[in-house]
């Protein structure tokens, strides 16, 4: 039981480090972007599918 706890703690620790490194890399990539057009395009890509799903859901509710 003790070795299981140790290995789980080790996996958690390594996963946390990996997540931290990924966040740092992502933040560095976001800082490298200088053009606001690229940021706007990325926001639109994230935003438009959500709006489409909401509108289709509302039209389904209103149509009944």
Swiss-Prot record:
The keyword Secreted is assigned to this record: yes
Signal peptide: 1-22
Propeptide: 23-46
UniProt modified residues of type Leucine amide: 62
Biological processes, Gene Ontology terms: defense response to bacterium; defense response to fungus; innate immune response; killing of cells of another organism
GO cellular component annotations of the record: extracellular region
Subcellular localization(s) per the UniProt record: Secreted
One Pfam family matching this protein: FSAP_sig_propep
Alphabetized UniProt keyword annotations: Amidation, Amphibian defense peptide, Antibiotic, Antimicrobial, Cleavage on pair of basic residues, Cytolysis, Fungicide, Hemolysis, Immunity, Innate immunity, Secreted, Signal
Tissue: Expressed by the skin glands.
InterPro entries documented for this protein: Frog_antimicrobial_propeptide
Superkingdom, taxonomy of origin: Eukaryota
Function: Antimicrobial peptide with activity against Gram-positive and Gram-negative bacteria and against fungi. Has been tested against S.aureus (MIC=2.0 ug/mL), E.coli (MIC=3.0 ug/mL), B.dysenteriae (MIC=1.5 ug/mL), and C.albicans (MIC=6.5 ug/mL). Can regulate or mediate antimicrobial response by stimulating mast cell degranulation. Induces histamine release. Shows cytotoxicity toward solid tumor cell line HepG2. Also shows a weak hemolytic activity.
Record family assignment: Belongs to the frog skin active peptide (FSAP) family. Temporin subfamily.
Name under which the protein is recorded: Temporin-ALa
Organism: Amolops loloensis (Lolokou Sucker Frog)
Lineage: Eukaryota, Metazoa, Chordata, Craniata, Vertebrata
